[in-house]
Amino acid sequence: GVDNLDSAPVAVDGEVIYLGLPGLGILLIDRLTSDIVDLWTPDDPNGIPDEDVNTLALDFFGGLLVGSEVQNTGAGSNGGLARWDGSNWQLLPTSIPGWNNDPFEFYDVSSDVNGVYAGTNRGACMWNWPDPNNPQSQFTLEDCWTSGGNGGGGGGGDGMPSRFVIAVDPIGPDLLYAGTTEGAAVINTSNGTVVEVWTAGDDTERARVHKYLDTIYLGFENLGIARFNLTSGSWLSSWDGSQGILDDDDVTVLIEGREEGTMWAGGDFGLTLIDLVNETVMAQWDRGNNQDGPTLPNYSPAEILIVDNLM
């Protein structure tokens, strides 16, 4: 067994579960039989770039994105962000002009038709997809948006609440949500500007996001769930331990429910299923034993996936 990990990212591709084990690599598990299929390490023939895996995600085109914590080597591609296409690894470029601007700690990855996004220790970064009509085409680093106000990106400063971006999610055409340790931002990736910033009143180690209709739900540790209306550009009242939706302010996970208009929130309070339309609680399970409910681990959930009828 592997215990007391700081994180254990998970991704599911059909019948295969990819489980990231920081310091070891990626464990492959058969989802139907629970058998261990393989363990990818840097010493394996597939040559996983680094064993300190922080984040995993299946990308828009079906590849596996792997974000790791690596050495700041200054190389064109330091191996912190890699893509497995089913037969080969592709290392995404990480070199940014200037001193000590290269991202080398990758906390979250996501993608859409426009590109790949990563939350890093140097901001929220975007890569353009290779040209599918050119076999020699490679990923290109579009920009990294970071803290400070001098403009220019690439370490120059773009007005982000913090350079440590721990969550990235596309939330609309050319719009990227970036959650940081000190707040959140919305980035227009088409013109490279930070268009909305929310500064937290406390440091947070997580910044989860879920979008339903025209509202963005932001889950933070220590702060509860902040809500932002995209149409009006205004903040709604937050959901925390005093609002009756959550029993505690520490939110570690947000994920869409199986029914439209529902959302699961996880944290120190356990798991809560929320009806977003009526702003009511549909189910609430504490950590540990629950009468007429499941027995949950005694720790706050770090990742949640729903596949078919299983969470």
Predicted features along the sequence, with ranges:
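A short loop-to-beta-strand structural motif that recurs across blades of beta-propeller domains
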Residues: 24-28, 78-82, 123-125, 183-185, ...
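Short loop/turn segments immediately following the C-termini of beta-strands
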Residues: 22, 69-71, 76, 121, ...
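An edge-strand/N-cap motif at the start of beta-rich repeat modules
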Residues: 1-27, 31-38
